[in-house]
Amino acid sequence: MGIVDYLVAAVSFRTLPTTFVAVLVYLAIFISVLITDELPATPKDQRGLNLTQAYSDLRQIAARPHPYNSHANDVVHDFILTRLQDATAGYDYAHVFDDKVSNGSWSSRNNSVYFEGTNILVKVDGHDADKSGALFSAHYDSVSTAPGATDDGMGVATLLQLVEYYVKHRPQRTAVFNINNGEEDWLNGAHAFLEHPWSNLTDTFLNLEGASSGGRPLLFRATATAPVRAFREKYVTHPHGNVLSSDAFARGVVRSGTDYSVYVDGRGMDGADLAFYKGRSRYHTRYDAVQYTDGGVRSLWAMMEAAQGVSGALLSSEAVHGDKGGAPVYFDLFGQALIVFPLSAMITFNIVFLVVGPIMLALLVTFDIVARHRRQEMIGGGYEEQGFFARAWTSFKSFRWVGGFWKHAKFWVALAVTVGLQVLLCVGYLYINPLIAYSSSHIVLLSFLSLAYLSTYLVHNIPSPTDTYGSHLPEQQKQAALFQLYFFTWILLLAATVVGAKLSVGSFYILSLWNAVLFAACAIGSIAGLLSSHTVEGDASYGSRRRIRGVRYDREGEEEGVESETAPTEVTPLIAQPITVVAPGGKEGEEVSGAIGWWFVQFVLSVPAVVILVSQLALLMLAATEQTLADGSPAVTVYGGASLMSVLAILPLAPFACKLHRRVAYVALVVLIASTAYAWLVFPFSERAPLKVFFQQQVDLDANITETRITGHPAYLRQAIAALPSAGGAPLNCTADDAKAGLQTCGWTPPPALEPSVIALDFNVSRSEGQNQARFEIAETDTRACRVYFDQAVTRFQVHGGTEGVQKGFEIPEEGVRELRLWSRTWDRTWVVDVDREGSALTGRVACEWSEYASGSLGVETRTRIPAYEEVLTFLPSWAVASKFADGLVEGYKAFAV
């Protein structure tokens, strides 16, 4: 075998070259995706920003928990205000406003709110004041159980840097900064901002959020294509975003809310959410602190870098203003580029390929068939053969049709087997260890990937027992599988186009690309067939020698590898035809190979691009959903998603599976066994990924009864509670929780030493004669948050001394509400509230909330103590961590009837 033969073998569709290319491509993609999913290093050139100062600001902001209803919140407010006043001093076009005048009322489906804001606003006048400006928003309050390093200390520290930057580099358009308070108590600070005149100066916004514990910030969602363009690599060095998260919000899959919804629904602004999303197990817990943040200072820089780039575009580029561009489709590539286009463009692209693609391929296949037939006639020399029906009957009796049928059916059989096995593996996870994805999602994904590869490889390598006529030659198998895969994606693309057009879903962009590249691969295969020299029995590249028909039908009985001549007949050529029936390469026992070079072009077209997009989407989806299980999200969503991504990552390899080395399958089998065994046997939680449970104490002030309640996943809740001394021996009352679907709440009576201090509530309720109206007078003690629960719906309310009416776009629903929340910017407030009701009777509860505790208030003077929560912090197992159940860690209440 000479050098030329070796070179030919190296580029032929053979086992070793195909396996080498496939393994190399998949490894390169997986490694690249994993590496680029990590935070990049901080650059030396910080482009006018000061990372050191920002990190120092973050440590001040996130020194301790500082919810709206805490004295620590006032400390953070004063720190931020001082920083901004110092940063803007001496610049007459920069204005700071400590907004302690904006009050408002608004409603949602279940409750109404009256809120008194303490936002800190900054306005930097642009050179072109006549043009609409841009709003930049973050909230400085945290939840009561977390210092708020990522939620939302990093966002606030970033805005402080942007203010300093734009004060020194005056923008073209006006920049408005809303560093708001009360977001954690359901977006109250953003609502208060809408009451301020500066909210009318902007037509677009960027909201900075943190729904996790760091990592790379993600373009969570966007209103239209225009604001997404501000995230392109032209402005943002390391863009990161995917339309999947936006679609998840729009469909209600993500059960969360940000100020984004207030700006969109209340003012109709265009804009985007930029938020952290990894490590949700530490979100809203004591681990949302500076020292526990994923990536630390690099995470902070990632948000600063992205926010600076986006803000620069929003304040200068006309492309992100004016024409909205409709619903967007966007995704990043390795954190280096952001691909963005309107959903309408994708729908048009899909329709074109749905119509043109099949027609073009049908024409190419027809031309190929006609060309083959003409060659057969030329080779046959015009001699008569058996008729069509006679040949068909002969083929049927000899079961030759089975081989052809199996060649086209094996893709669908492999797909069915793969889906079936994936379902079984999902069921195994759900029954054996349903929460293992919480801490080991990459192991779970590895098991699904290895199973998908095994099932695809094994089925595609099952031979047909009647395949003695070359119907399973590798080139033909590949081309048949490519066409089956194209048809499969065509069906998916048709469904995706209908759904995408009706529901404005852009996450199907992978199907658009997949169908297009498969069209190209199938077309190249057909064109290669037209250009190649074919024989009656197969492609000349498979090593067959041409025969005239009379000789061909005299071959029966020849053994493979035996060189012979046919007996002479009246149609035998004058020159003898020596024939060796061997595999390509000319030696007995060598494997059958395909055409030189074309398979590689088809592989490069149909595999890498799809696998890249699927791999990135898989990591994003797992990172965003794996730890939502503690919030009550169904586990089938996580495992079903991992399974789907695995199948989509392996399916592009199906046409080439017949030429993959069996040793890769051995490796996949070992990986499957090891990863599945690990995932089914290991405890699902750790100190790195702790199970989140939710704490609240409720105090019945009428009966003087206190109950400690902890809510969590029912499979592990009792095990976590058993570690608490106060729960030892106490009867537990455990019920399904209505507020957090899928979770369970267990309550018990704590000893007197663990009852909260300074829990006092005085109120009076009276009825107006002749009217269906009641007046509540509520006196707070060491709190600024109270609420009223109604057993009967109320249709109107008015807080004395507050603003009249309800915010536009957030009116009380026609059926009324059954809860009224009252938030005061001052302490120990006495509320006077009038409410209208439908019927004559009105009953319910008046309650106040407390959120401060000793260890969370170090350095801040407060009288409130919650020893039961201190017990939870001290004795909860290391694999569990506590978060707040509601706005208040303690709720004290009294009943009323009028």
Swiss-Prot record:
Keywords of the record: Glycoprotein, Hydrolase, Membrane, Metal-binding, Metalloprotease, Protease, Transmembrane, Transmembrane helix, Vacuole, Zinc
Reported function: May be involved in vacuolar sorting and osmoregulation.
CDD domains in the cross-refs: M28_Fxna_like
Protein name (Swiss-Prot/TrEMBL): Vacuolar membrane protease
Topology, Vacuolar side: 36-342, 433, 501-509, 615-635, 686-898
EC number from the UniProt entry: 3.4.-.-
Transmembrane regions: 15-35, 343-365, 412-432, 434-454, 480-500, 510-530, 594-614, 636-656, 665-685
Active-site residues per Swiss-Prot or TrEMBL entry: 183
GO biological process: proteolysis
Gene Ontology cellular-component terms listed: vacuolar membrane
Keyword Repressor found: no
Binding site for Zn(2+) 1: 139, 151, 209
Cofactor: how and how many bound: Binds 2 Zn(2+) ions per subunit.
A Pfam short name: PFF1_C
Cofactor(s) needed: Zn(2+)
Binding site for Zn(2+) 2: 151, 184, 284
Glycosylation sites: 50, 103, 110, 200, 704, 733, 764
Organism superkingdom: Eukaryota
A Gene Ontology molecular function term of the record: metalloexopeptidase activity
Cytoplasmic compartment segments: 1-14, 366-411, 455-479, 531-593, 657-664
Places the protein is found: Vacuole membrane
InterPro entries named among the record's database cross-references: Fxna-like_M28_dom, M28_fam, Peptidase_M28, PFF1_C, PFF1_TM
